[in-house]
Curated annotation (Swiss-Prot):
Taxonomic placement: Bacteria, Pseudomonadati, Pseudomonadota, Gammaproteobacteria, Enterobacterales
Catalytic reaction annotation: N-succinyl-L-glutamate 5-semialdehyde + NAD(+) + H2O = N-succinyl-L-glutamate + NADH + 2 H(+)
Coiled coil: none
Pathway where it operates: Amino-acid degradation; L-arginine degradation via AST pathway; L-glutamate and succinate from L-arginine: step 4/5
UniProt-recorded name of the protein: N-succinylglutamate 5-semialdehyde dehydrogenase
Function: Catalyzes the NAD-dependent reduction of succinylglutamate semialdehyde into succinylglutamate.
Binding sites annotated in the UniProt record for NAD(+): 220-225
Length: 492
């Protein structure tokens, strides 16, 4: 039984799904998808649970959420192993994901009060008050690259605000989704407040098509995000939050320490085997001898990155991709770029057939026209050379996406210029593109999102504002508007 609906574990009535370790092929999890009827059942359970959950005090909801944080802490080793084995990422990185989940709780509680708490302003004849109210039943679609942390970034603030939820993990990480759900069960959430439905496209379409849904919170590919946007068009009553990745630029200008710049670039492009939505996909490198030296060093260090299994010792920097198919898609993308005229500096290699262990790739595309503006979700970095900084900014902005952008330079003036010219929701200076803080908003513009950033701003899309003018008494104004007559004279 792998679905959690209305406080009970039930067996899915849809197709059988089997999840294997992407490197070893070991079967980790199997269960049946939720069919459309079970998705509807989960929605009805969430709707029935909503009034009571929403009417609890914030403190009562906070107690349950903080109990979940404690369970994450006490089960950290077990959840780390599940995430690492299912995604293929190394143990160290899965552990940082669980830590981020724990830290998200306190941050979300603080953000609720700062972003969507209550305010009162005194007026001469009363007061103006601001309160926030939950939307109702929300669907949360989770991604596979951070199957614990990223859904957590929607679920926690949504529950704190008083919403009830139907959670669909990625079909590529059902085990992680179930493991997290079992911790929520132990935290003592009332039946129906949080429901789990497993499945792929059919389950997702059934969930997003529900009429009795108040909103949908999504993290994933641009293609799926656009499909959801089209599906919910003409339904302004439903809140829709989309985080859809990017084709992110990193600009390398003058550098004092080449190794430090190479380290930042590797952290930006290849961490999580290139499977972060903020990963650098396009590297813009200043022409000249220093740029040449940087590129040579970047290739030399990158070719030492050998992917390993989740439990290898010593631990590798990167593990496998989510699947062999995902790894092959990166290889295919590199081959297509090479066929267009790209100059391969480091060829990506599948270490072993039948696995997802893929070494990083670097290809220079300077002077090549018609390069697709698409996110290649893996360890493949494309390089362009530029002559002046204005040109670098123009090249960086030459994308329909707008998630993250970064600059390596000792000059604050150039960063200020980039801040004015960049079209991205995250713009970093001498920090990896993959670096982000939950105490700041996380999201992009263009094809990277729909102006509903998460992290610190997640509270904004989890509740709607209610403004009130209030007075504890009613008296006739001393001065009346023209044309109003409240005298005792009888009009004849």
């Amino acid at each position: 039984m792998t679905l959690w609906i209305n406080g009970d574990w039930v067996t899915g009535q849809g197709a059988l799904r089997v999840k294997r370790n992407p490197v070893s092929g070991e079967v980790l999890w199997q269960g049946n998808d939720a069919d459309a009827a079970q998705v509807g059942q989960a929605c009805r359970a969430a709707r029935a649970a909503f009034p009571r959950w929403a009417r609890l005090s914030f403190g009562d909801r906070q107690v349950r959420v903080e109990r979940f944080a404690g369970l994450l802490e006490s089960n950290k080793a077990e959840l780390t192993a599940i995430i690492a084995r299912e995604t293929g990422k190394p143990r160290w990185e899965a552990a940082t994901e669980v830590t981020a989940m724990i830290n998200k709780i306190a941050i979300s509680i603080k953000a609720y009060h700062v972003r969507t708490g209550e305010q009162r302003s005194e007026m001469p004849d009363g007061a103006a008050s601001l309160r926030h109210r939950p939307h109702g039943v929300l669907a949360v679609f989770g991604p596979y690259n951070f199957p614990g942390h990223l859904p957590n970034g929607h679920i926690v603030p949504a529950l704190l605000a008083g919403n009830t939820i139907i959670f669909k993990p990625s079909e590529l990480t059902p085990w992680s989704g179930e493991a997290v759900m079992r911790l929520w069960q132990q935290a003592g959430l009332p039946p129906g407040v949080l429901n789990l439905v497993q499945g792929g496209r059919a389950t997702g379409q059934a969930l997003s098509a529900l009429e009795d849904l108040d909103g949908l919170l999504f993290t994933g590919s641009a293609n799926t995000g656009y499909q959801l946007h089209r599906q919910l068009s003409g339904q302004p009553e439903k809140i829709l939050a989309l985080e859809m990745g990017g084709n992110n630029p990193l600009i390398i200008d003058e550098v004092a320490d080449i190794d430090a710049a190479v380290h930042l670039t590797i952290q930006s492009a290849f961490v999580t085997a290139g499977q972060r939505c903020t990963c650098a996909r396009r590297l813009f490198l200043k022409s000249g001898t220093q740029g040449d030296a940087f590129l040579a060093r970047m290739v030399a260090v990158s070719q030492r990155l050998t992917p390993g299994t989740w439990d290898d010792e010593p631990q590798p920097f990167i593990g496998g991709l989510i699947s062999e198919q995902a790894a092959q898609q990166v290889v295919t993308a590199w081959q297509e770029l090479e066929a267009m005229g790209g100059r391969t500096l480091l060829a990506p290699r599948l270490l072993q057939a039948g696995t997802s262990l893929l070494t990083p790739g670097i290809i220079e595309m300077t002077g090549v026209t018609g390069v697709p503006d698409e996110e290649v979700f893996g360890p493949l970095l494309r390089v362009w050379r530029y002559d002046n900084f204005d040109e670098a900014i123009r090249m960086a902005n030459n994308t329909r996406f707008g998630l993250s952008c970064g600059l390596v330079s000792p000059e604050r003036e150039k960063f200020d210029q980039l801040l004015l010219g960049a079209r991205a929701g995250i713009v970093n200076w001498n920090k990896p593109l993959t670096g982000a803080a939950s105490t700041a908003p996380f999201g992009g513009i263009g094809a990277s999102g729909n102006h509903r950033p998460s992290a610190w701003y997640a509270a904004d899309y989890c509740a709607w504002p209610m403004a009130s003018l209030e007075s504890d008494s009613l008296t006739l104004p001393a001065t009346l508007n023209p044309g109003l007559d409240f005298s005792d004279e009888v009009v004849r």
